[in-house]
Amino acid sequence: DRAAKENELELIPCIQTLAHLGGIARWPEYANSCFDLNDILFVGEDRTYKLIDGMFATCAECFTSRRINIGMDEAHLVGLGKYLDKHGYENRFEILLKHLRRVSEIAEKYGFSSMMWSDMFFRLANGGEYYCVNNTLPQEVKDLVPKNISLIYWDYYSTDKSHFDAMIKAHKQFDNNIIFACGDSGWYGFAPHNQYAVFACESAIRSCIENDIEDIFVTCWKDDGAECPLFATLPVILSAAEFARGNFNIENIAKKFRRLTGICLENFVALDEVNLNAEKTNNPCKYMLYSDPFLGIFDKTLNVENGGFATVKEKLQIGTKNRKYGYIFRTLKSLCEALEIKYDLGVRTRAVYRKKDCAALKELLRDYKELEKRLKVFYRLFLTQWEKECKPNGFEKHDIRLGGLMQRIRHCHNILSEYLVGKREGISELEEDILPFNKE
């Protein structure tokens, strides 16, 4: 908070007061008294509001700003767990609004003005869908939403300006202040999706400007392990800031990016290519890293003839020399080196096994050994990246994942070795056909 103030920035707390609270449900004190079902709080219970009061008290102590994001997104099953058992079925709009009023009262108690994600109002009116072309809301809902709460329209998955236009129009059914949130798309795995996110942000921000939306921010979520480096999405952050100022000249933005970071924008977005230019936000650099060499659920998704990691690795080499951000490029270059072997290892293993080509299998064992070495290098660089950017909390997940991956590679190597010397008659996993992952 002090650092933000020194840089003339306002640090606004963003909490959850309805769903996405599964972490705290690990403790029986909360799980048994505060939760409706899954990660959704039990609306109407005193213990729930004691918990929320504590959240606001902490935020009031830690933050200078008296604006707060109270969350409330994606509570798809609100009112359908313990609440249903206790009260029977109730109109879920009414449950949501009842809870919102209680949370608003607590916010006001601590001097906060609130903003919240808007999706649940639309989902409850449209069969669970948020992004509907003809989004209409019951008049009583529009009337009952407290007017002092800003509504945040969030949208990370479209590049179509007309889509944003329609959704902003739908939000303007409310008399509330509307805020827009786009995303940096840095939450899909180890590599960013800068080019996709910049394109999406440009369309969205053009729409916001034309539709008089003044407040815009970029979300930088870190789902499922926070593997993507924090600064790997700098092209999105800078581009969004320039778009918001009315500058849509990519050449001009690229010059500014080079001046601020010391890296050519074109070289920086080479980070995206670790996913081999996958469609939209697909993340093969993650799922093929962890795909099992023998079970291969994702093997049918591969274009085996177009691995491309050697080419990407060479592009990333340029960025490794940058003083400030070189560590990002070193980590992802190392991942490319591991994926050069790992990406299609399962496909190659199954193919030579089924041909009963013992000479080729023996040669393949070298790949398993080399892969383990490259994974150890990647682990060390990824750990260095984590310690530079993050608190220790959370890396235990990567110890388990990457440690488990290396153990599985060793195990598969041993199984193949035993087969080659006659200790196994066959390898049943490799005799099964891999089913298509996507509908063909």
Question: Where do the PLM segments sit?
Answer:
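Active-site groove signature of glycoside hydrolases
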Residues: 17, 33-86
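Proline-centered flexible-loop/turn and helix-kink motifs
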Residues: 13, 27-31, 35, 64, ...
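Substrate-binding groove of N-acetylhexosamine-processing glycoside hydrolases
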Residues: 2, 8-10, 49-57, 61, ...
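Short connector loops/turns at beta-strand edges and beta->alpha or beta->beta junctions
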Residues: 26-30, 73-77, 184
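Acidic/aromatic-lined carbohydrate-recognition and catalytic surfaces
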Residues: 1-30
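Short, solvent-exposed loop/turn and secondary-structure capping segments
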Residues: 22-26, 81, 163-164
